From Swiss-Prot:
InterPro entries in alphabetical order: eFR1_2_sf, eRF1_1_Pelota, eRF1_1_sf, eRF1_2, eRF1_3, Peptide_chain-rel_eRF1/aRF1, Ribosomal_eL30-like_sf
Functional summary from the UniProt entry: Directs the termination of nascent peptide synthesis (translation) in response to the termination codons UAA and UAG. In B.musculus UGA codes for tryptophan.
Lineage, uppermost ranks: Eukaryota, Sar, Alveolata, Ciliophora, Postciliodesmatophora
Name of a matching Pfam family: eRF1_2
Subunit: Heterodimer of two subunits, one of which binds GTP.
Keyword terms: Cytoplasm, Protein biosynthesis
Keyword Nucleotide-binding: no
Protein name per the record: Eukaryotic peptide chain release factor subunit 1
Disulfide feature: none
Origin species: Blepharisma musculus
Protein family per UniProt: Belongs to the eukaryotic release factor 1 family.
One annotated Gene Ontology cellular component of this protein: cytoplasm
A GO MF term: translation release factor activity
Amino acid sequence: MEGDELTQNIEQWKIKRLIDNLDKARGNGTSLISLIIPPREQLPIINKMITEEYGKSSNIKSRIVRQAVQSALTSTKERLKLYNNRLPANGLILYCGEVINEEGVCEKKYTIDFQPYRAINTTLYICDNKFHTQPLKDLLVMDDKFGFIIIDGNGALFGTLQGNTREVLHKFSVDLPKKHRRGGQSALRFSRLRMESRNNYLRKVAEQSVVQFISNDKVNVAGLIIAGSAEFKNVLVQSDLFDQRLAAKVLKIVDVAYGGENGFTQAIELSADTLSNIKFIREKKVMSKFFEEVAQDTKKYCYGVEDTMRSLIMGAIEVILLFENLNFTRYVLKNPTTGAEKTLYLTPEQEENHDNFMENGEELEALEKGPLPEWIVDNYMKFGAGLEFITDRSQEGAQFVRGFGGLGAFLRYQVDMAHLNAGEEELDEEWDDDFM
């Protein structure tokens, strides 16, 4: 993956995680501030607005809510001062306020400000009991969207592929008359009826294409793939019935062995060369390569949190495969008596088990604690590794998450994981003996 693309993928991943956290947050009254400023705005005007809002907040009757709102407005104004009245090139996103728990007690104070990885066109200022994240979500769906029309003698399907997400928009079946074997006038009449049915079918497909892929008189996809198992796909594209605005967007016509959703899947795969930058295709290719390494037992792969992190730290990893929603926490723990440190990677269930934080009857001190995926994203380059994000929205990605734990890697050289693990167990036993 090229540097710019990987940087954008990392920024998108960070925004997804931020959205998850912000959507869960709740504040007291209208104490949570969502402020989004596009690059065309003037920062002094925004500062003046915040000052005026502070003055108005003195009218809030509830003392607790008033203090929370004023605290958030003060923090917002202080943060804006850091930009010296000059907005970043892509605009500014800011969230600020005190988040409360179910008992109404302040749990955490958010002050988050950053420049989005691409220019944002939305202007937003809202004080509410929740953060408003829709503009962030809109940033994530700005990948090119491609349309698919799957057409054969049994029916048609209309779908889209955007990033990792494919969607069936509409589908319908058709019962076309077969060729008539009799001769004479009967054959001519049936032939005429058959051609009329085919033309009506093509007209319906052409009309539905406009419904699905044209909005406000503009084509709403970056390109079209037409697929099918018979001549219908070629006839459709060449037909005067097919809207010329859509015809101009046809990127490729592909032969598929199936109709319907199976044909949709095959069409995505067969148009891979045309849609090479679509993440869905990339994910399938990366995962297919990984599964091939596993099947051939090349020993140039690893999977699972423990083996992958061990391989990363020893510098053996070429590319890390990271499930975007991997739910592990990284701990660095210290034995207060011996001073020995160790690193653990725990699931939420394992974090509930207090035994994981005990050693020889002593409670271990937590030196570091944080989400494992964030640590990987912040540190993978220090070990000379690359990074690929994996979703569970493709069949291969879902298999990787279910069967391989959502974390794996391609290795630079062969590593015998079984031998490596056995060696570490022997070292652990020797370490234990030293302190028995």
